[in-house]
């Protein structure tokens, strides 16, 4: 529909003017599972007729990766990166006009106005805050300026004989601190 068609029959789409379309993809080096996922992305893109190549021919060590992304390397067309919102999900920290970690560089007036509402004193009202976040979610879904592909999760096993353990221990969100931990028995609970 956008005019990118396979005009020479090689199974890959060309630019609208008929020239070769190649997309450079940057991804961080992490673990074997990530390397497999990156290769799978390349296969899926090829299946829909896109010639996507790894920028530098391989995944990139994390520090170098983020240096290149933050520098807006013109050779990178699309990238896969990780991020988290921490305890405050305010999108201003990742998608604001001056946000240091706005790696997508996507900013427009509509999104900025929603972020301003989320960051306003009006958002102290819980119902308004929920309304503003729902508006942001609808906006982000509609614009699709980034596409989440993975959600991190962790499981922490703690024996029942340990009291006051908290997975966020030693963070400002924790209600417990390390000095409060107790072990109630010499033998593990079963």
Language-model-detected regions and their locations in the chain:
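Detector for C-terminal structural segments
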Residues: 1, 33-43, 67-190
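Ligand/substrate-recognition segments at binding pockets and active sites
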Residues: 4-82
